[in-house]
């Protein structure tokens, strides 16, 4: 349903603020006129570059967590099209994580179909190395990401936000399939051994050294600035108001 909604909104829009070059290409390929499409970057990165996130010591005090270091940040959402496999997939992830001594910070999933099974599985697996949050304030979430060793799961934040912190991410399954990703993202299947191998790769010194000069393909933290300028410079003319598909 998300994809269908995005296509519908695109047809109604007169100006498009795309998050990356691939999104620009897809919009134009779908029939949108080139002069309407701007690559401005992902707006959620503005917070990161403007340092609008909490320091780890503040987060520890707020949530009464002691010595929070050497941890994975994990967000695994159900996939509607894979409803029958959601429980098996989350159990594979839980099983894979048991092979690592790092602490696990879980953010419980959205409310899409299959969410209850995912939530129950995560809660049932809880041990002394795990912290589980139903949701977090944005500043806390970004602070936890900045200080994590890996971001694991199938959230878009593993593709979009984590590269700005130069934090590797393990992207599991099909939820983010075909989305633009940087070299910091390791894609893998739902298989337990594949997840284990991907986590080991993300923890390796050789892999992490490659990220020192990483530039986030989703932007540089100046999205709002670009959008404001474009809106100010755009004149409301017949050319803007009257749309036609260019294919």
Predicted features along the sequence, with ranges:
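Short acidic-hydrophobic, aromatic-tinged amphipathic segments that line or gate anion-handling sites
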Residues: 18, 38-40, 133-134, 186-191
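Donor-nucleotide binding loops and adjacent catalytic segments primarily
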Residues: 53-147
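A conserved, positively charged/aromatic
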Residues: 2-14, 145
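A nucleotide-sugar donor-handling region in carbohydrate enzymes
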Residues: 12-88, 247
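C-terminal amphipathic helix plus adjacent low-complexity
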Residues: 204-247
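A donor-sugar binding/catalytic signature common to diverse glycosyltransferases
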Residues: 16, 137-183
């Amino acid at each position: 349903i998300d994809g269908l909604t995005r296509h519908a909104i695109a047809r109604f829009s007169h100006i498009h603020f795309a998050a990356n070059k691939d999104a620009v290409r897809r919009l134009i390929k779908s029939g949108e006129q080139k002069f309407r499409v701007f690559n401005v970057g992902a707006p959620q990165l503005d917070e990161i570059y403007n340092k609008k996130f909490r320091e780890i010591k503040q987060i520890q005090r707020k949530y009464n967590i002691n010595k929070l270091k050497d941890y994975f940040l994990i967000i695994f959402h159900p996939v509607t099209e894979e409803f029958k496999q959601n429980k098996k997939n989350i159990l594979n992830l839980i099983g894979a994580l048991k092979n690592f001594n790092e602490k696990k910070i879980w953010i419980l999933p959205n409310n899409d179909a299959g969410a209850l099974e995912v939530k129950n599985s995560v809660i049932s697996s809880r041990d002394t190395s795990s912290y589980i949050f139903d949701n977090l304030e944005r500043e806390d979430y970004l602070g936890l990401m900045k200080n994590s060793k890996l971001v694991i799961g199938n959230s878009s934040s593993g593709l979009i936000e984590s590269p700005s912190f130069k934090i590797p991410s393990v992207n599991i399954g099909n939820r983010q399939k075909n989305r633009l990703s940087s070299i910091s993202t390791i894609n893998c299947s739902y298989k337990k051994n594949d997840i284990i191998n991907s986590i080991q790769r993300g923890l390796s010194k050789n892999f992490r050294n490659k990220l020192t000069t990483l530039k986030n393909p989703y932007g540089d933290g100046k999205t709002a600035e670009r959008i404001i300028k474009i809106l100010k410079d755009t004149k409301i003319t017949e050319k803007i108001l009257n749309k036609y598909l260019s294919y």
